Amino acid sequence: MLGPKLAEAGHELTDVERAEKPSFDGQDVAIDFTRPDAVRPNVERCLDAGIPCIVGTSGLGPDDLAALDAKAKDKGVACFVAPNFALGAALMMRFAGEAAKHLPKAEIVELHHEAKLDAPSGTAKATAELLPGDVPIHSVRLPGLLAHQEVIFGGLGQTLTIRHDTISREAFVPGVLLALQHLPTLPPGVTVGLESLLE
């Protein structure tokens, strides 16, 4: 799904992992949407080769991000990491941060397909970091779902729900294209969050 959309936008996608003789020769950027257990070694290999990276795989913790940041700075390349590449999800996070200034009591409910490996999701954890206090996160894994998140705020006599629903993985393509557009202008090191690229 990502390959054809990148090709439509004028980019060429090469699957280095599946190549007969894996090589980074001629590669401008590495994009990782793999698994939590593979993402850090994948990105470290790319950074060691001086290849800037875009990472959309959940599962990188603070220690992982710190190690990747140090390596990217050492190699003088940018590494962009986002818990979610859907523009609507980035806006949901931004709006939730704004709402929390006025309604500080909140809980997060995130719902994903049953094959999702992490719970809570990276998006839910990143959203919780934007809100004051220790925000409870409720995770649901069921067939029939793709990716959904709502932030429910409660105040005196009222509630506010900010919700984002991903109904197709195509929702991630504009965010990846935005990251590709901004990657050459990012400083060496790790930059986190699609919202940092939204004007």
What does each model-found stretch correspond to?
Residues 23-31, 47-53:
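Short acidic/histidine-rich motifs immediately flanking catalytic phosphotransfer sites
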Residues 37, 41-44, 48-49, 57-81, ...:
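Rossmann-fold NAD(P)-binding glycine/threonine-rich loop
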Residues 85, 96, 113-117:
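Short beta-strand and adjoining strand-loop segment in the mid-core
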Residues 31, 57-58, 84, 116, ...:
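Glycine- and other small-residue-rich loops at beta-strand/loop junctions that grip anionic moieties
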Residues 34:
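Conserved NAD(P)H cofactor-binding loop of Rossmann-fold oxidoreductase domains
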